[in-house]
Regions:
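Transmembrane alpha-helices
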Residues: 187, 191-209
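Structural signature of hydrophobic alpha-helical transmembrane segments
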Residues: 25-36, 74-86, 151-155, 202-210
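Short amphipathic alpha-helical coupling elements at transmembrane boundaries
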Residues: 92, 96, 133-141, 176-180
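Hydrophobic core segments of alpha-helical transmembrane domains in multi-pass membrane transport
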Residues: 32, 36-40, 66, 88-89, ...
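Transmembrane helix-bundle core of multi-pass membrane transporters
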Residues: 12-27, 106-167, 194
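Membrane-helix/interface signature in polytopic inner-membrane proteins
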Residues: 159-192
Length: 210
C-alpha cells in the first residue's frame, strides 16, 4: 500500500512539474498570485467601507463593455477598463449628488446596465466565444497583457495606499473626523473607486462577470 501511494505521489508530482512547463499554466499561476495580492490589499478597505455591493455591481455592469467590444470587434479587455472606470465614477457621483441611498443608486444603475448589456449581447451574430469567456472566466486564457495590466493596477494601489495608510484608515473609520483634520476625503474616495474599478476589470477575464 505504501509503495502504491508513493508511486502515485511521484507520478502526480512529475505530471504537475510537466504542467508547469507550459506558458499558459505559468501565466495562470502568476495571474492568480497577482490578483490574490491585489484583492487582499483592497479587500479590507472594501469590506470596512461597505463597498462589497459596489464592486459586485461594477463586475456585473461590465457586461456592457464586453458586449460592446465583441460588437466592435475589439479586445473585450480593453473595452472593460474604460467602461468599468466610468461606471464606478458615475455611480459614486450620483451617490454624492442625490439623497438616495447608495444601495438604491447601485440597484437602479446596475439594472439599467444589465438591460443594456443583454440587448447588446442579443445583437451579436455568429460565434460568441469572447463574450462567453469573459462572462464565465478562464484563468488559463490569461495572456501577457493581462498580467501587465494586473501588475500596473497592483503597483498603482500600493503607491496610492501605503503612503496614505493612516489617512485611509481614519477615512474608513470616521470620515467626518478625517475631513476635520484636513484630509482630502473626496479625492481619496474617488481615487479608491478608480483603483477598485480597475481591479475588478482586470480580474474579470480570470473569474468572469457572473
Amino acid at each position: 500500500m505504501i509503495v502504491k501511494f508513493s508511486w502515485f505521489a511521484v507520478t502526480g508530482l512529475s505530471n504537475l512539474l510537466e504542467l508547469l512547463q507550459f506558458p499558459f499554466m505559468q501565466r495562470a499561476i502568476a495571474g492568480a498570485i497577482l490578483m490574490g495580492i491585489l484583492g487582499g490589499f483592497l479587500g479590507s478597505f472594501v469590506t470596512l467601507r461597505q463597498l462589497s455591493f459596489f464592486s459586485h455591481a461594477v463586475g456585473h455592469a461590465a457586461l456592457v463593455g464586453v458586449a460592446l467590444g465583441v460588437l466592435l470587434q475589439l479586445n473585450p479587455t480593453w473595452m472593460l477598463l474604460p467602461f468599468t472606470l466610468v461606471f464606478g465614477l458615475v455611480v459614486l457621483y450620483l451617490i454624492d449628488q442625490t439623497n438616495l441611498s447608495s444601495d438604491s443608486v447601485l440597484s437602479v444603475v446596475l439594472s439599467g446596465a444589465l438591460a443594456i448589456g443583454v440587448i447588446l449581447s442579443s445583437l451579436i451574430q455568429g460565434y460568441r466565444g469572447n463574450l462567453m469567456g469573459v462572462l464565465f472566466g478562464d484563468i488559463l486564457a490569461i495572456d501577457t497583457s493581462d498580467l501587465i495590466l494586473t501588475g500596473l493596477v497592483l503597483i498603482g494601489s500600493i503607491i496610492f495606499l501605503l503612503p496614505t495608510l493612516r489617512q485611509q484608515i481614519l477615512l474608513t473609520l470616521n470620515p467626518t473626523m478625517a475631513q476635520v483634520q484636513g484630509i482630502p476625503v473626496r479625492l481619496y474616495r474617488y481615487a479608491f473607486v478608480v483603483l477598485l474599478s480597475l481591479a475588478v476589470a482586470v480580474a474579470i477575464k480570470a473569474v468572469g462577470v457572473l
